[in-house]
Design a protein with these regions (language model features):
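Pocket-lining segment of extracytoplasmic ligand-binding domains
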Residues: 44, 50-138, 149
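Short intrinsically disordered coil segments
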Residues: 20-24, 112-115, 158-160
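Segments of small-molecule ligand-sensing domains
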Residues: 126-182
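Bilobed "Venus flytrap"/periplasmic-binding protein-like clamshell domains
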Residues: 2-65, 69
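Sec/Tat-exported extracytoplasmic proteins
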Residues: 10, 25, 30, 43-50, ...
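Residues in well-ordered beta-strands of folded domains
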Residues: 7, 98, 144
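Extracytoplasmic
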Residues: 1-3, 21-23, 92-95, 138-140, ...
């Protein structure tokens, strides 16, 4: 599961819902990416659009750096929770990981997103990062192959994906992913 992480500058009052991000400076994933689409889909459900928020679409590393420099009020990142960039942002004392308290409701309105929880202390038990359970939404990553791909290659791909991804992550249980259909 690839969660959608939203980080706020600590100096920005945490809005009760994402609707409170209207009028803010938001750094978004690259325009046209699935990550940007997910972020814009969630924001649109709360009435936040390009017309009423200042959205900048940057590459992930540039987006994180701009957020950390204070050039934006909030940043949207859709990455695996064990990604080094996510860990860096979680550990930044000037940033707060924003919870989607309506994660189940979001997943009922946007069918490709699923609710997930990042447990308190999941990143660092000693420093207790994050300092609270954080409700998130995320999307599964799909691998689609051509119908004429040789079955042995398909089997090898499935075997490799199981080897790499079958373990527990910070937001999913062991064996939950990958799942095969078709």
């Amino acid at each position: 599961l690839q969660p959608l992480f939203v980080f706020l500058r600590r100096s920005v009052a945490e809005p009760a819902t994402p609707a409170g991000l209207a009028g803010r400076r938001l750094v978004m994933p690259l325009e046209g990416s699935a990550s940007a689409q997910a972020a814009e889909d969630v924001l649109a459900r709360y009435g936040v659009t390009r017309e009423n928020a200042h959205m900048s679409f940057l590459r992930i590393g540039d987006a994180a750096a701009a957020l950390q420099r204070g050039e934006h009020d909030a940043g949207f990142f859709m990455l695996a929770p064990d990604n080094a960039l996510i860990r860096r942002l979680v550990a930044d004392p000037e940033l707060v990981l924003y919870p989607f308290t309506e994660s189940v409701g979001i997943s009922r309105n946007i069918d490709y997103l699923q609710p997930a929880t990042l447990a308190r202390g999941a990143f660092d038990l000693r420093r207790v990062l994050p300092p609270r359970d954080v409700a998130l939404v995320g999307a599964t990553v799909n691998v689609i192959v051509r119908e004429d791909l040789h079955p042995a290659v398909v089997y090898a791909l499935l075997h490799a994906m199981n080897e790499v991804h079958q373990g527990q992550t910070l937001v999913s249980n062991a064996g939950q992913y990958p799942s095969q259909t078709g």
